Swiss-Prot record:
Role according to the record: Involved in osteopontin/bone sialoprotein dephosphorylation. Its expression seems to increase in certain pathological states such as Gaucher and Hodgkin diseases, the hairy cell, the B-cell, and the T-cell leukemias.
CDD domains: MPP_ACP5 (cd07378)
Disease: Spondyloenchondrodysplasia with immune dysregulation: A disease characterized by vertebral and metaphyseal dysplasia, spasticity with cerebral calcifications, and strong predisposition to autoimmune diseases. The skeletal dysplasia is characterized by radiolucent and irregular spondylar and metaphyseal lesions that represent islands of chondroid tissue within bone.
Name the UniProt record assigns to this protein: Tartrate-resistant acid phosphatase type 5
Length: 325
């Protein structure tokens, strides 16, 4: 029995007392690239295994929300608001009782942009737990019983950098709408400059840094990375590469890659494209059922635990509360 499973069992036994005495914290799951398949049964064994383990984790440890990091519907998104994929890839898969009232905050990936992203946004008015108000947006939370606050900036990295073909091109070439890309980047700069929260997170689909199949996203290394350092961002969360990674740069910015919700890829082909010392953890075992990141933010620190869909704890790291600007 690994330590994570033992912890889950212990906390299950102590659940009544934990409800009263647990350390106040904001807790959430970050999972990317979970979007099933376009043919029956419209989900994969890995997606089902992740849904089951997410439900178990939420039931025992709790979660205030789930952060969806894009590629919500493989391989070409959804066609309209009535697309059956909403039901068969999302609602019917993440259906455990423990998940029914947990909100999802959603952003789009490159495969979503091959379909109708506006329909995913509009679905927010139909589903009680699907929250996707606009292509990019800001979330604000307070840790219960404290004055400690958390901001999360949800980006559309596809409109920022351009779409990418997983088979023909590893890098997004250019944004389709340059004006929209500039608008989003300007919005983010202003938001980060004004952010006074104790923790500031940014989330998008494409990675800034990755050692895997797609590698670092040149557009984000050039345009986003300097903003993360300048404005003291705690961490950047993403998917796109189908594995789990944690990287940290010389400025202390954490890079949480959680793209193992539906596929697993062991590739390390871009390991030499990432600066020495950045990579702290990588997991892409082909026979694995995938996994996700579980984040807990307290008044003192932010903890990120990578969990395999089998229930095994793979890696854990901590990031400090940032100094108030």
């Amino acid at each position: 029995m690994d330590m994570w499973t033992a912890l889950l069992i212990l906390q299950a036994l102590l659940l009544p007392s934990l409800a009263d005495g647990a350390t106040p914290a904001l807790r959430f799951v970050a999972v990317g690239d979970w979007g099933g398949v376009p043919n029956a049964p419209f989900h994969t064994a890995r997606e089902m295994a992740n849904a089951k383990e997410i439900a178990r984790t939420v039931q025992i440890l709790g979660a205030d929300f789930i952060l969806s990091l894009g590629d919500n519907f493989y391989f070409t998104g959804v066609q309209d608001i009535n697309d059956k994929r909403f039901q068969e890839t999302f609602e019917d898969v993440f259906s455990d009782r423990s998940l029914r009232k947990v909100p999802w905050y959603v952003l789009a990936g490159n495969h979503d942009h091959l379909g109708n992203v506006s329909a995913q946004i509009a679905y927010s008015k139909i589903s009680k737990r699907w929250n996707f108000p606009s292509p990019f947006y800001r979330l604000h939370f307070k840790i219960p019983q404290t004055n400690v606050s958390v901001a999360i900036f949800m980006l559309d990295t596809v409109t920022l950098c351009g779409n990418s073909d997983d088979f023909l091109s590893q890098q997004p070439e250019r944004p389709r709408d340059v004006k929209l890309a500039r608008t989003q980047l300007s919005w983010l700069k202003k938001q980060l400059a004004a952010a006074r929260e104790d923790y500031v997170l940014v989330a998008g689909h494409y990675p800034v840094w990755s050692i895997a199949e797609h590698g670092p996203t040149h557009c984000l290394v050039k345009q986003l990375r300097p903003l993360l350092a300048t404005y003291g961002v705690t961490a950047y969360l993403c998917g796109h590469d189908h594995n789990l990674q944690y990287l940290q740069d010389e400025n202390g910015v954490g890079y949480v890659l959680s793209g193992a919700g539906n596929f697993m890829d062991p590739s390390k082909r871009h390991q030499r494209k990432v600066p020495n010392g950045y990579l702290r953890f990588h997991y892409g075992t082909e026979d694995s059922l995938g996994g996700f990141a579980y984040v807990e933010i307290s008044s003192k620190e932010m903890t990120v635990t990578y969990i395999e869909a089998s229930g095994k704890s793979l890696f854990k790291t901590r990031l400090p509360r940032r100094a108030r600007p």
